[in-house]
């Protein structure tokens, strides 16, 4: 009873909250507004709280702890309730752009606006426009590896200079800014990357600090002030293709980290106006005009967070269309070699097995990567029953007790030690399953951020790499105010630097990519509470897969998944309860594998979602039904606006029988009215 629920028993805080809710119901306890879960870390604390609320004594004597192994009960024949089958609402969605006028919603702010420098002169021009509106403005310039943070005056404007990758520098900047009445932050620094390619970057990436890290530090330093305001503005500005990278081929995807941060921060400070703005590159060549365009959008237009502005001024939003792949399945070939990060077990392994099953006897090779080292004895456990595994787990527990100075072992220590064995067994199962399909697999223990290690691996395979599947990732959800800088950095770099390291392996193998896929997340597409880092990393990879496809380098697809049921991160306690409470559908393993196999072998490309209902995450109703397909002859006829001027949308068609259309009449579209 005195063991820490999370640290020693492995019960996460979400599950603890559920337990306390049940306790309140069972003991009919009144609602206690002053109850703090972290003040009750053990069951003894829970018991004392119950007695206090019921009017009993507080002190509770803890019974002696008896260390006993888990016993496998003898099966007893008894009726087993049928499992509740979840309806599969998840499907494939293709991300496209849709014109978005936005709502006429001007805002007027009092205070000072912080603007990060862009390198094109837009930030200063924007500051002058802000001052014309009666506000004040300061600039923050990001310069990598400068020794000291500094501030000076430029034409009566305060300008700070700091290294965005130096948390101490950024803390000093924020300390100075907190002396002011900060009304908002406009992050234009990603525009510096509009004139540079990702290939120009270092490894580890220095560009990512310009787009994400400095922005995160400023938000963290100003978060409390933003929370106290009734209104305010937070925005990021990029220059990909005016459509957040959905069609262009010449842009630097690292810029998208800023968009990911903005989209997620929106869910933390919903009372602020937020905008992740992507400008067509031609628009930023005229600094004055670009500043006016940005100011007009930020101060005059409400609605969606993620907006693209094309060269002709049209506004675009990204939406998702229900769309199935219809091409024939093309199996892998004997000379295909895929390198697969995170491929030993879990979601990625299940997906790769699916591809292998649809490429029977192809002789393709899968190089599976993971951080875990294999435990040789687990190779013999592949066919073991649950009873055999439990027996071995109990013997491991006794080994840990014998090796412990205290003669005890906690549940967390036991499970952590066992995890090494279970993961190793999972890898051997994955390899065996792939080999049974007539393909080959090998496992390599290497950190995806170890660029040199991956280059060595690529050179040692003896086969040119033709495909990358990047499934590795970390997730550590915390609000900006409480998120650790080093955690933010690690979550992003596993995805972003990991991708670059995998490309290094391809190069050293002498291969040319035919196919690439990144496992991303719906949090990258829409943003999500507490996931600024995860969203930033996935936003970059989403855009990069679209860019690779558009450039013809290779066919590439980013699959943004919802949570998977019963595999990978989804096996954490209380996972399903959290998603159910948020109204988010999780995807079954079978459906997820089906979607990925289609992307890999049926021509999937650019950005795809594998999800169902996303609850409040879909804040702006981004999902669309599949567009109606018309016979070619009919489509060409009704496309002529002179013959059919009142056809905006075809709702239904029965060929050669009937056609139902929809039209919106407006003076703007029909001046004759």
How would you describe each model-predicted region?
Residues 1-304, 310-315, 322, 328-673:
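4′-phosphopantetheine-dependent carrier domains
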């Amino acid at each position: 009873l005195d063991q820490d629920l999370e640290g020693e028993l492995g019960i996460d805080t979400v599950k603890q909250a559920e337990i306390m809710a049940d306790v309140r119901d069972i003991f009919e306890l009144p609602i206690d507004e002053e109850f703090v879960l972290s003040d009750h870390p053990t069951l003894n604390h829970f018991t004392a709280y119950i007695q206090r609320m019921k009017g009993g004594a507080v002190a509770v004597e803890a019974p002696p702890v008896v260390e006993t192994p888990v016993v496998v009960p003898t099966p007893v024949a008894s009726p087993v309730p049928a499992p509740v089958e979840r309806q599969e609402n998840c499907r494939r969605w293709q991300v496209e752009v849709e014109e978005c006028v936005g709502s006429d919603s001007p805002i007027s702010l009092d205070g000072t606006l912080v603007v990060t420098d862009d390198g094109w002169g837009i930030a200063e021009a924007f500051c002058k426009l802000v001052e014309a509106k009666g506000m004040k403005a300061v600039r923050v310039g990001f310069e990598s590896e400068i020794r000291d943070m500094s501030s000076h005056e430029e034409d009566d404007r305060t300008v700070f200079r700091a290294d965005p990758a130096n948390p101490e520098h950024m803390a000093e900047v924020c300390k100075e800014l907190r002396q002011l009445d900060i009304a908002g932050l406009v992050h234009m620094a990603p525009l510096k990357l509009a004139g540079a390619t990702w290939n120009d970057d270092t490894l580890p990436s220095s560009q990512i600090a310009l787009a994400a890290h400095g922005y995160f530090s400023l938000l963290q330093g100003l978060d409390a002030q933003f929370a106290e305001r009734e209104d305010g503005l937070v925005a990021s500005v990029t220059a990909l293709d005016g459509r957040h990278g959905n069609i262009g081929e010449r842009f630097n995807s690292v810029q998208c980290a800023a968009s990911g941060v903005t989209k997620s921060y929106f869910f933390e400070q919903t009372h602020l106006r937020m905008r992740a703005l992507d400008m067509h590159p031609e628009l930023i060549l005229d600094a004055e005009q670009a500043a006016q365009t940005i100011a007009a959008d930020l101060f005059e237009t409400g609605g969606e967070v993620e907006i693209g502005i094309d060269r002709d001024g049209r506004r675009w939003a990204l939406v998702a269309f229900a769309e199935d792949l219809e091409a024939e399945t093309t199996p892998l070939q004997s000379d295909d070699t895929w390198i697969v990060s995170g491929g030993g077990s879990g979601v990625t392994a299940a997906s790769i097995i699916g591809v292998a099953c649809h490429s029977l006897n192809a002789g393709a090779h899968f190089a599976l990567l993971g951080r875990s080292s294999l435990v040789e004895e687990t190779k013999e456990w592949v066919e073991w029953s649950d009873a055999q595994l439990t027996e071995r787990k109990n013997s491991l527990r006794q080994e840990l007790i014998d090796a412990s100075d205290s003669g005890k072992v906690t549940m967390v220590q036991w499970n952590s030690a066992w995890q090494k064995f279970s993961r190793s067994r999972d890898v051997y199962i994955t390899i065996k399953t792939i080999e049974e399909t007539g393909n080959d697999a090998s496992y390599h223990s290497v950190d995806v951020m170890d660029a040199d290690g991956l280059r060595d691996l690529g050179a040692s395979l003896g086969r040119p790499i033709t495909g990358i599947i990047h499934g590795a990732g970390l997730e550590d959800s915390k609000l900006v105010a409480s998120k650790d800088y080093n955690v933010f950095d690690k979550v992003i770099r596993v995805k972003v630097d990991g991708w670059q390291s995998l490309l290094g392996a391809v190069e050293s193998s002498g291969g040319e990519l035919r196919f690439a896929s990144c496992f991303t997340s719906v949090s990258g597409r829409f943003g999500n509470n507490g996931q600024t880092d995860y969203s930033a990393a996935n936003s970059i990879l989403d855009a990069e897969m679209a860019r690779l496809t558009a450039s013809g380098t290779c066919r590439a697809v980013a699959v943004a998944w919802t949570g998977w049921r019963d595999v990978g991160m989804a096996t954490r306690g209380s996972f399903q309860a959290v998603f159910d409470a948020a109204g988010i559908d999780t995807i079954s393993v079978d459906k997820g594998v089906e979607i990925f196999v289609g992307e890999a072998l049926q021509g999937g490309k650019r950005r795809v979602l594998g999800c169902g209902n996303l609850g409040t995450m879909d804040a702006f109703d981004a999902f669309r039904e599949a567009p109606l397909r018309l016979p070619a002859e009919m489509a060409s006829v009704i496309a002529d606006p002179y013959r059919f001027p009142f056809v905006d949308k075809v709702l239904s068609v029965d060929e050669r029988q009937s056609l139902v259309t929809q039209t919106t009449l407006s003076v703007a579209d029909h001046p004759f009215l």
